[in-house]
Amino acid sequence: MRCRRSFAVAVTAATLLWGTPATAGATSNNLVALWEMNESPGAQTMLDSSGHGLRGWIGDEVGAGVWVGGATGYRFSRLEPDTPPTHPRHLAIVPDATALDPGSRDYAVTIRLRTTERFGNIIQKGQATAAGGNFKLQIPSGIVQCLFRGSAGSLLVAAPRAINDGGWHTVRCVRTRAGLTLIVDGSTVARRSGLTGWIDNAWPLSIGGKTNCDQVSVGCDYFAGDLDYVAIQAA
């Protein structure tokens, strides 16, 4: 990320924050975590600039301190899908914390990414069979999808077009009590009504792929590309 102001611009560009125009415009009070990904090459700690101390661990296969297209971020190299061995050091991981679980709150995840690949889980907390539910953003066939699964059910929204063109894109997924909304580069591209309910698991938050996988019966879905920042908000 170039600076804190970059994140503020990305957030307020969206006409929808928690699902209604009346609440558009994020403030620092909404922030749960902000990982600006400005660390130097070789860094092992992912800093949280929200003030909440939700630091993460940067695997040594993650390229920190990469400058590309006017932004400093992390680079995740391409790994062949569903091909052993696993690469746990391909991930950036934040330990489980109550603040990171959506619970029943309105909850938004914002990421800025660039990729030319057609697969991978960008960010997730929990997996498909996790007790307590899970959420994730993934990019199969270059198309961003967002999923939230909770006590009341599961919802998935997907962008209508691929964004794996090598350019920077800002993706925002908003879970409210009414459903899911997906915003790409400031425009709402998908919306689905429905309930997801309570989401609270004991898993870490993982950036770059799954933490519990073997690349045989469970693929690790490693992301390949660059990330500029990740932010989480809740209200």
Q: Which role does the model predict for each range below?
A:
Residues 2-26:
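Secretory targeting and sorting signals
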Residues 22-88, 190, 232:
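Extracytoplasmic low-complexity segments
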Residues 27-30, 96-109, 129, 160-167, ...:
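Extracellular/lumenal carbohydrate-interaction signature centered on repeated Trp-anchored short motifs
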Residues 29-32, 41-46, 82-145, 180, ...:
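Extracellular glycan-recognition modules
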Residues 33-36, 48, 109-115, 171-173, ...:
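Short hydrophobic/aromatic patches on beta-strands that form ligand-binding or substrate-lining surfaces
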Residues 95, 146-170, 217:
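Short, aromatic/His-centered strand-loop micro-motif at the edge of beta-sheets
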Residues 167-181, 235:
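Localized edge beta-strand/strand-to-loop motifs within extracellular or lumenal beta-rich domains
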Residues 192-226:
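Flexible glycan-contacting loops in extracellular carbohydrate-active proteins
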